[in-house]
Amino acid sequence: PVLEQADALIDQGHLYKTGGAASVARIEVNGRQLVLKRYNIKNTAHWLKRFWRPSRAWHSWIEGHRLEFLDIATPRPLAVLEQRVLGLRSRAYLVTEYVDGPDLTACFAPYVESGDAPEEQVDALVHVMQQLIRERISHGDFKGHNLFWHNGQWSLIDLDAMCQHATQLSFA
């Protein structure tokens, strides 16, 4: 039911981002908080670049499951949909669990002047970076707004540019 009414749910939800390449909203379905992301097609040129390869939603779905398998925190991917026109990819949607908590930027903002950030959060940030390095994973958009503090660890979001590199050379 969520994906059948995805656009309406995004319009009714708490919008985090709208327009451009993606629209993201926190939605509530049967009392459960979820995040619904619509990957938009901006124009014909964008469509020509995207229609022939798996969508960014599909890529995020795969990478979310990869992180889950590797025990790297990320909101659990729950559903993905690629819309097609005459068999060619068009818009795509991703549904994930909602992770409640502040992002890294908000967590560390009070400590910019002093540099005295909470040791637990700093250690957890080092830990997630070590996990990514160990697995040769580059996030593709690794910034403070894409890391959320949840249950004592940093949880990664916005995985559509994530890549696990086959060799150390390609990772470096």
Language-model regions, residue ranges each:
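C-lobe/activation-segment region of protein kinase-like
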Residues: 155-172
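Short glycine/proline- and charge-enriched loop/turn segments
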Residues: 42-46, 111-113, 158-160
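Structural motif
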Residues: 29, 149-150
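Conserved ATP-binding subdomain of kinase catalytic cores across diverse folds
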Residues: 2-105, 124-135, 139
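A short beta-strand motif that forms the metal-chelation/ATP-contact edge
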Residues: 93-97, 153-159
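Hydrophobic residue at the +6 position relative to the catalytic HRD Asp in the kinase catalytic loop
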Residues: 142-149
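AlphaC helix of the protein kinase catalytic domain
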Residues: 104-114
